Amino acid sequence: MATISKKKKKVKVTPEGAVHIKASFNNIMVTITDLQGNTVSWSSAGKNGFKGSKKNTPYASQITSEAAAKEAYDLGMRHVNVFIKGPGAGRDAAIRALQGAGLDVRTIKDITPLPHNGCRPPKRRRV
């Protein structure tokens, strides 16, 4: 039986782009796009082998950001603008990991959606 070889396309991207970090209470997702919004690379804590409550830790966000940044760096991206959304832990660790992977962080913008007294929040947990 013939084996199917999966060929990954090599795309040269522009050296500037945007990093979108979504840090929820349960997971962290990092998406790196070019200036038009086309996805260059992405990563999440679950994709990197973290399960359950370990997905929303600063260490998981560091590993996740490094994985996405390394892939984008190999494709030619050098300068990024960072957009952070969500209340999760490890937001700062994700930015530090991007800088450590060789990407030049130009701006950091918090785009967390805040309600103007919209929906009623869930009740308090009693543990």
UniProtKB/Swiss-Prot annotation:
Family statement: Belongs to the universal ribosomal protein uS11 family.
Subunit structure: Part of the 30S ribosomal subunit. Interacts with proteins S7 and S18. Binds to IF-3.
Keyword Ribosomal protein: yes
Entry protein name: Small ribosomal subunit protein uS11
InterPro entries in UniProt: Ribosomal_uS11, Ribosomal_uS11_bac-type, Ribosomal_uS11_CS, Ribosomal_uS11_sf
Organism: Pelodictyon phaeoclathratiforme (strain DSM 5477 / BU-1)
Record keyword Magnesium present: no
Domain of life: Bacteria
Primary role: Located on the platform of the 30S subunit, it bridges several disparate RNA helices of the 16S rRNA. Forms part of the Shine-Dalgarno cleft in the 70S ribosome.
BP GO annotations: translation
A Pfam family annotated for this UniProt entry: Ribosomal_S11
Gene (UniProt): rpsK
Record's GO cellular component terms: ribonucleoprotein complex; ribosome
GO molecular function: rRNA binding; structural constituent of ribosome
Keyword terms: Ribonucleoprotein, Ribosomal protein, RNA-binding, rRNA-binding
